[in-house]
A protein has these predicted regions:
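Acidic (Asp/Glu-rich) sequence patches and key acidic residues
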Residues: 1-103, 107-109
C-alpha cells in the first residue's frame, strides 16, 4: 500500500505485537500484528494530522516511496480524493475498534 509506505516512519511510533510474544515498532511488511486499544488511539493521533495535511494538497500529486529495503525511490501518482478516502477508512476502523473496546489485527503490506 503506497500511502502506508509513505507515512511509515511515523507509524513506527505504534507498538504492535506478533502472537502476543514479539513486540514490534510499527507494522510488518509481511505477516500479522496485533494492535492494542491504547495503540489504536495513538494511530488516530497520527493519522488525523496526516489527513489534515493531505486536505491541503493539490488534487493530483505524487507520493515518493521507498522500494522495499532498497535505496531506490519511486513516485506514485495519486489523487487527493483517493488518499483522503483511504485515511477515512483507517479512521473508521480505528473508531469502531475503540467503540467496541477491541484490538485490531493488521495484515502486512
Amino acid at each position: 500500500d503506497h500511502l502506508m509506505r509513505y507515512i511509515q516512519d511515523s507509524m513506527r511510533w505504534i507498538h504492535t505485537s506478533w502472537n502476543d510474544q514479539i513486540e514490534l515498532e510499527g507494522f510488518p511488511d509481511e505477516g500479522f500484528a496485533v494492535i492494542t486499544e491504547m495503540e489504536v488511539e495513538r494511530i488516530l493521533e497520527i493519522i488525523r494530522p496526516w489527513k489534515a495535511l493531505f486536505l491541503a494538497s493539490p488534487e493530483n500529486f505524487c507520493l515518493t516511496i521507498q522500494e522495499d529495503s532498497d535505496i531506490c525511490y519511486r513516485e506514485v501518482p495519486v489523487t487527493r480524493r483517493e488518499v483522503i478516502e483511504e485515511m477515512e477508512g483507517w479512521i473508521g476502523i480505528c473508531d469502531l475498534a475503540l467503540k467496541q473496546h477491541s484490538q485490531l489485527v493488521y495484515q502486512g503490506l
